[in-house]
Amino acid sequence: YRKLVPFSGQASEAEMAEGEGALGPGLRGKRHPNDFALWKASKPGEPEWDSPWGRGRPGWHIECSVMASEVLGERLDIHAGGCDLKFPHHDNELAQAEAFYGSQQWVNYFLHAGHLHIRGLKMSKSLKNFITIQQALEEHSPRQLRLMFLLQKWDKPMLYSDQAVSDARNKEALFKNFFGAVKALLRG
């Protein structure tokens, strides 16, 4: 069912772990290593419902495809997410939504954005290289932050660095001077 990354072969154990997390005790009997959980046994304190497979909850791929379909309908024009969601998450969403709706194409276009990188690494709380929007706004204007991201390719890692902010400030000054000159010319 690898539709978005068809030539990548078997999923690695790391990819499957990333995509599924810890499977509940009742879901160890997979028929194929690449099978994904449609229903998971709940951990203590998690929401759970009765089902023919026991008490539990939907797997996260089902959660996402159902929420998207509920709001947007049986077919989506554009579906977006981080580049790390291409496989297995988005492929799994496709597999189940296309099977449910009996369609060949649940989504027309996927946009997979690059991650935010700080000090050369993907931003992550666990790496302690994390910054909140509020913290960024204490040092930079919303316009500077927007320009910083607009100056980078959307599908590649986005760099948050002193140089990237400096480039954005320079562009902001350039635009401000340009539009100031245009206004002066129009006033005549």
Predicted feature descriptions by range:
Residues 1-185:
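Alpha-helical recognition segments enriched in aromatics with Gly/Pro capping
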